């Protein structure tokens, strides 16, 4: 199995939260070590319950995760994880950083400056116009515009960046294969997007 698969597997174990993964990675260096660990070794991990160990064991036998892994490749969904050259190092500075980022397109260039523009969904027309203006101007200055693709300020800023030929990326709370809100489907197809979840 490839290292990528083990990362995908550990991120898709039913009930396995970031907090539990952090406990596992305090003991194991890689997802492959978790995959191959004995029950006794798994039981030695602080705050990992028997139900978590059962979920790990079940996920090893279930080919559903492997099928999902194959499917995302066919859909053009890729992912990165800590230690990969394209994983955004700045994320490692936050306490609860994601172990996997799913994305389509390309991730931001870490050697170029970025700006985040976020705001109200229910904004005034003036606010929407100013957000689009900022997006256009920042893109014109070579800044990468990062936002959330929500209605209102987020979408307006990204539309402005795209209009000016700039790079814009949406960080999604849902899977990268889901356009939410649906009214932003045109923006969704233009953007390069990333997400902590594949679906």
What residue spans do the PLM features occupy?
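Glycine-biased, small-residue-rich flexible motifs in mid-sequence functional cores and linkers
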Residues: 1, 81-195, 199
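Short, small/acidic-rich helices and loops at N termini and domain boundaries
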Residues: 1-83
């Amino acid at each position: 199995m490839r290292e990528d698969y083990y990362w995908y597997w550990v991120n898709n174990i039913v009930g396995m939260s970031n907090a539990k993964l952090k406990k596992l990675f305090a003991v194991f260096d890689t997802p492959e070590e978790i995959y191959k660990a004995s029950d006794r070794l798994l039981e030695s991990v602080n705050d990992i319950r028997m139900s978590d160990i059962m979920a790990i064991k079940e996920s090893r036998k279930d080919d559903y995760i492997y099928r999902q892994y194959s499917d995302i490749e066919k859909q053009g969904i890729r992912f990165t994880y800590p230690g990969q050259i394209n994983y955004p190092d700045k994320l490692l500075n936050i306490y609860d950083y994601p172990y996997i980022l799913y994305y389509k397109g390309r991730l931001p260039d870490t050697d170029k400056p970025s700006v985040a523009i976020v705001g109200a969904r229910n904004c005034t027309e003036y606010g929407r116009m100013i957000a689009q203006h900022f997006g256009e101007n920042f893109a014109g200055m070579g800044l990468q515009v990062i936002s959330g693709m929500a209605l209102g300020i987020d979408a307006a800023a990204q539309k402005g960046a795209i209009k000016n030929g700039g790079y814009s990326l949406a960080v999604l709370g849902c899977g990268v294969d889901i356009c939410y809100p649906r009214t932003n489907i045109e923006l969704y197809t233009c953007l390069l997007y990333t997400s902590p979840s594949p679906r």
